[in-house]
């Protein structure tokens, strides 16, 4: 039943850009009236935070469980792109996310995925063409077109790309962008195609060009891509066109903080408090037309209580008048989610990862901790008995992708630097964006054990050293069906195991691994079909002439 109550404090009015003592009266989950007050407790009332672009699945939690974790940090809603599960299950996956999140006191805004699969150079579990996208956009609970990753298609006027953009425009729904590194005239053409936002900027110069082209920028700080430090000076340049987002946030990170962390960091650097809070609370609501309250009379009673605007400790979170979190504890009950999946891969053998030596010079992916992009190096090929092999002493490891959507497939194998493994292997069925099984390892037998642990669990993340540990992800091979705190603890233990037993010093090894198959972000990536140059947008050989 919607709540009715009154609460007093120092109200942070983000529209008037003022702070005043007030009593807020909530009636049936709606803010009935706001009255001036002379004496109020030393606490602040302000609108709740919105994550302006996030893949809920990356937290390895279904929406209902994601909400339980996020409200603890003052988040009351998300702009969520469900293209992870859509790549596995198609429209059924999108409908699953909407249905799982609907009963929870939280505002999920799921978009229509625009690029499923992300490219034609990989195998996914589904394909969403213009008709399927249009049908999703017909729904009132699908308020926008998710990130258009096919920026070459948008720039070149590819009919299927423009059809999806047009489907959103005729329904007066926003179109999200995704254009890492796009500069110059291409930016103007991309924006002219109808793209309104971007969250992929890694340099402030890139962001300025996109702002100049008329786009809005979501400043991203997730578990893999961390762009806050580079982009936050934009708060002094274009505060009215900024939002905050996490994009991809793993369960351990979500347990520790969310958008509140970015707000706190921005405020501590001295940026205007109203500019910062409007970016975190108001701009996503206005841009996407979300039915989320902004602490005004007649709004849904969505707001948070914090101790002060410096420490910004979230004491209480309210959604439609319901107290959903208090002093770091969620009040949303855990409800078991349905399990849906598609996982057809069979176990592999160590011999499946053999690579005949095809030359003296080897093309190697260079992975970068806390970034989605990669580099490329050419090294002398390490060999043994006629095969190209991993060389942990030089941090040259094998990288493999196994097609999860067929029973019979040969792993695609390449080589990578950056993980620093002394031995063993790790594997994951979270492998953007088609979510095959991606693995990195120092030995073929360890690669086989890590991959097979994921295969037998029908989805998960694993690490193989002397033993093998696995975190099962039975929901589409992406999400757990356990409570968020259990998932966070198990994920942390597995990451610690990778550092202690496999020797990696990476901050987020599983997140970094999961993006090595994302072909739409350059430079060098690996799909289940081979080594791919994301800048040239073509397959390349493992060996260099």
From Swiss-Prot:
Annotated EC: 3.5.4.2
Keyword Hydrolase: yes
Keyword Manganese: yes
SUPFAM superfamilies found in the cross-reference section: Composite domain of metallo-dependent hydrolases (SSF51338), Metallo-dependent hydrolases (SSF51556)
Annotated InterPro entries: Adenine_deam, Adenine_deam_C, Amidohydro-rel, Metal-dep_hydrolase_composite, Metal_Hydrolase
Alphabetized NCBIfam families for the sequence: ade (TIGR01178)
Name under which the protein is recorded: Adenine deaminase
Organism this protein belongs to: Salinibacter ruber (strain DSM 13855 / M31)
